[in-house]
Amino acid sequence: MTESSPDNRAQIDWLQHQWVIAGVVASAARFVPIPFFDDAIRTQCRRFVVARTLAASGSSLSTASLKPLYGESGGLVATSLRAIARAPLKLILFPVRKIVLIATSIHGVPMEIMKTVLLGRTLRRQLASGTIDPGRAKAMRLALEDAFARMDFHTLRAAITDSLRGARSWKASAIASARSLSRRPLASEEAMPADDQIELTATRVQKVLDRPETAKLFEEFDRRFDQAYAARSTGAPR
């Protein structure tokens, strides 16, 4: 089945819709005044993207084997110790950090959606090209960050912001979904909690992503990711 076949195109569209929903929910966590909430929800949403993409691609890899793509790498003890060490400083800075997140939401929300979608897109591309070595997951994450930092997403960011303005009450619905996630993490086969308003919002955002100019922009991102990933994998200068 080729990527341009109707069945495969429909699967890609469905998968991208799931990525957008996850990005919308992740972006709304910044509006909840609870310490560590946004980090935890972002991790869960990105884990969902990885799990959904692996399942849709028919991969035998476990979600946990690609943990560097959505959370901190390393063992449970090491991860817990790092979190404990950072907790006091994060609590002290929480009020300032939260104010900044809310004040910059007009930029931060669409950027969070884009990052979530590009995580899924890149993982799907890598799975389509062959087997992924879980040992290179951290290099993949760093290459994603490298490529994203080198892109000019101003026009796309503005278009996504406009699409969100046209969706009423998306923020309240997304916050409710984020709170639901915080109470009970998703099992790997579960869908992201999304009501009709979130579905509508995701559909509006997806129309922006389906534009020809967005496709060209994402192709450029793919090229830059491939370069960064190759450099990260070989240790060559970027």
Feature-to-residue mapping (PLM):
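Membrane-active amphipathic alpha-helices enriched in small hydrophobic residues
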Residues: 24-32, 37, 77-84, 88
